[in-house]
């Protein structure tokens, strides 16, 4: 059977979210910072699923493979000071994702990606709202095609390059769907939280780059 592959990549930058809470994390290995970012990741996925369920869409299962792909990209962007879907070597995002979220053994395989960074702190509700307020990001989040998701939220007290040496928090969310063939894999389901309450509107979007590729 011919393999179908669909790729969606969307990129969003916002600045100044809850700027009064900004402060150095003390490094990626600081226990408090690690726990806080893990909580942010869990809350973003829970709110994503609550939003999908409220619109009659299935919640997404948390994939360890997509999680690894997302964390890897967030770490690379902070370390090398860039904000793009492409890897630092210029290879397209789906090549990176496929290293973790394999297509081999499946008849269909598709992936998508949303990115966000902020120079301040950000809540899960604000991440979801920023993406929902962007039509292209919203379309990615609410696509009925996706079955799995992974997220990587990382922060650096001083990130160079594009980030100008400022404290920066980067969020990568990778979406995926694969089916058929012999490569079926068991995944765990993230239970959605109730619909999030309204939050203050985030700052204007500074950059948006939607990409759609079909093979």
Where are these regions (language model features)?
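Surface-exposed patches in mature extracellular/periplasmic domains of secreted proteins
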Residues: 54-69, 81-91, 138-153
